[in-house]
Amino acid sequence: MQYPILLTIFLLLTNAYAQLPGKWQPRAPMPSARTEVAAAEVGGKIFLIGGYDKGGQLVEEYDPVKDSWRPRAPMPKPLHHIGAAAVNGKIYVIGGYISGVGPVDTVYEFDPGTDQWTSKKAMPTPRGALAVGIVGGKIYAAGGVTTNGRNTPANEAYDPAKDIWTRHASMITPRDHHAVGAVDGKLYAIAGRINGNHDRSIGDNEEYDPASNRWRARAPVPSVRSGIAAAILSGKIFVFGGEYGRRTHDHVESYDPTSDKWQRWSPMPTARHGLGAAVIGNSIYVISGGPKPGATFSSVNEMFTP
């Protein structure tokens, strides 16, 4: 007697899920299968950097026009759980882990034009599984796991023009495996987990204003998760994938800082955590990541257009 009711509910939920906005398209897979990578865009190309498996030093460049990949100069050290950001045509790789060593304070600059790496001023607080965002030409590194195996609330800014670091107001909620996005001169630290614990993921969303050097709480992400990727498009922060407990997620949600509201979008075709995301034109490319919780790997490259 209950079967028709359950079937009706299932069909309604399936239909609602199918009607979520946004379109996904498969693109050329990355040559290597990895997870816990970072992605950055320079000159209309996407650079996938570091990660688990044999990809710790790998850098691969994706050309969305040709839908093809090519190798670039490897990083000086094998790193995963790094932060990466592009400023003035160069990519800065900040912190991360070296397997068997732990969190590091290193900063490396990559110049795509010369295909060369340069060591820069070390970060004050060694950490991995951090997140970075850019405001006013400076790269803010927030949170992560430091050398004692616990979260740090550190919020430190790197100025590539001067090669110096400055300390700023600590995060309200220290975390790792989160994302940071910058919109209209403010940073948003979204989701993550506590002290690296898969079962302690959070949905907290906190805004940092560099002008006032203050944090404040904003609307939390509807889907609690960690190991996410984020990208900025049309003034919104799009959050992709992640994991929580014993499963990975295909969720896509965007945050509008103006309205302080979240919106759901069409789910990822391939659920993943530890993935990278970068914007080209009006689309976001979501690449690599683990399809199962823990150390699993993929070469998936999927293009999302809102």
Protein language model annotation of sequence segments:
Residues 4-15:
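Bacterial N-terminal signal peptides
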Residues 16-306:
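Kelch-like beta-propeller repeat domains
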